[in-house]
Amino acid sequence: MAELDQLPDESSSAKALVSLKEGSLSNTWNEKYSSLQKTPVWKGRNAGPAVEMPFRNSKRSRLFSDEDDRQINTKSPKRNQRVAMIPQKFTATMSTPDKKASQKIGFRLRNLLKLPKAHKWCIYEWFYSNIDKPLFEGDNDFCVCLKESFPNLKTRKLTRVEWGKIRRLMGKPRRCSSAFFEEERSALKQKRQKIRLLQQRKVADVSQFKDLPDEIPLPLVIGTKVTARLRGIHDGLFTGQIDAVDTLNATYRVTFDRTGLGTHTIPDYEVLSNEPHETMPISAFGQKQRPSRFFMTPPRLHYTPPLQSPITDGDPLLGQSPWRSKVSGSDTETLGGFPVEFLIQVTKLSKILMIKKEHIKKLREMNTEAEKLKSYSMPIGIEFQRRYATIVLELEQLNKDLNKVLHKVQQYCYELAPDQGLQPADQPTDMRRRCEEEAQEIVRQANSASGQPCVENENLTDLISRLTAILLQIKCLAEGGDLNSFEFKSLTDSLNDIKNTIDASNISCFQNNVEIHVAHIQSGLSQMGNLHAFAANNTNRD
């Protein structure tokens, strides 16, 4: 019976015959058959011959090990060839996530972001202001140290052992200590201050700014849509618009879009522009800079005020006030240490700006309404066009009145500058005169370079000199740090003088080839944002 138990069953024999007939006997059956033929040898304590025992499949004792009875294979195992795994590209046929599943994930994510700690974590992880972006999104400390320690290392594809060797040579970094955090905060403040100095063009030598990135962000201007960090009761990120810039304290005055938030003063390191912001290479700041000006002042000309001011007559408060006669005639009186006439002009300026702000708000709402009608392919009514044109004309008149008042206010600022211990700045007329003299000298040398004049017509020579003077004025404005409306006015006056001297048939050519390009350059040089209306022609002809 023992021998019968050791034989394979009929089903396995039939399978073996079939496989033999087909010429492919499986290895597994051979291993099974050979294992059935082998019987373990029981080694007893006596020195007698070994007794063969039948093979048992039952559970062995935990003290018994059959490793000694197994045959040791001296051959090394066959190594499979490594197959390079090529990442498969995602195709359009792959299943997209279910809409309900996406909504569920979005709902859970929204609930997560409602938590104060999760919201702050997102702010700390992804919110970087314009002044901090080049500092944090550039090379980290390890990359900087790697460049300094191994300048000849051109590759980044190193093995783990090679990277470990480099880390051992560089030493263990000091992290998460109070001294480390204090040092990092101090270094960050210094870099921010250096960027602010570059933005304000108060630096002539950039050799001390080698630790800054190659691209320096330009300061934000008035009217820029931003996302700002608001602290206090309403702690979080909110969208708004810049209404004022304070370069002295490095802050922005932001009016938030959400009702109830109002206007707040936000530091520049917590304000991020919603649109891609422009940067300037740090090498451009090393060019010749013009000294900063404390006051942006017009030419110091004697101004005779008119007997009746159209703005005062049309003003419901100042026009009907019983103190109008006293206030209008008080040229030498002071109030709070300032001339009364100066305070009147400041009041007018504030009122005009407030009215202009309301008109701009209405115009923005009408633009939104017009875009909505256009998206629905609906016609824009005549009444809508009439209201839109009325607002545009009123804005044009406000800009003219604003330019008049600004002229007077800045004239008083220029007169008050010596009393405050400030040095008056050079006048734009002086800059224009110097540019014209230099242009005439350049044209004269170029015209007589060959020994005889190339252009003999004096009118053409004068025209070339004036056009060259415009280029020199643009160069002076580009090299200057602080731009103001009166410097742009000198450029506009030069264009108007040239336009008045040329023939009427050439005015269209002059506008298309000269004036429009100068206007584009002037718009690019100006950093006054929505206040570019201040750079309009002075309509004060008194």
Curated annotation (Swiss-Prot):
Main location: nucleus
Keyword Ribosomal protein attributed: no
Modified residues (Phosphothreonine): 96, 304
Location(s) in or outside the cell: Nucleus, Nucleoplasm
Modified residues (N-acetylalanine): 2
Gene Ontology terms: biological process: DNA biosynthetic process; DNA-templated transcription
SMART domains: DIRP
Keywords, ordered alphabetically: Acetylation, Cell cycle, Coiled coil, DNA synthesis, Isopeptide bond, Nucleus, Phosphoprotein, Tumor suppressor, Ubl conjugation
Annotated GO CC locations: nucleoplasm; transcription repressor complex
Residue list for modification Phosphoserine: 65, 95, 309, 321
UniProt superkingdom: Eukaryota
Cysteines paired by S-S bonds: none
Sequence similarity: Belongs to the lin-9 family.
Subunit structure: Component of the DREAM complex (also named LINC complex) at least composed of E2F4, E2F5, LIN9, LIN37, LIN52, LIN54, MYBL1, MYBL2, RBL1, RBL2, RBBP4, TFDP1 and TFDP2. The complex exists in quiescent cells where it represses cell cycle-dependent genes. It dissociates in S phase when LIN9, LIN37, LIN52 and LIN54 form a subcomplex that binds to MYBL2. Interacts with RB1.
Protein name in the entry: Protein lin-9 homolog
Organism: Mus musculus (Mouse)
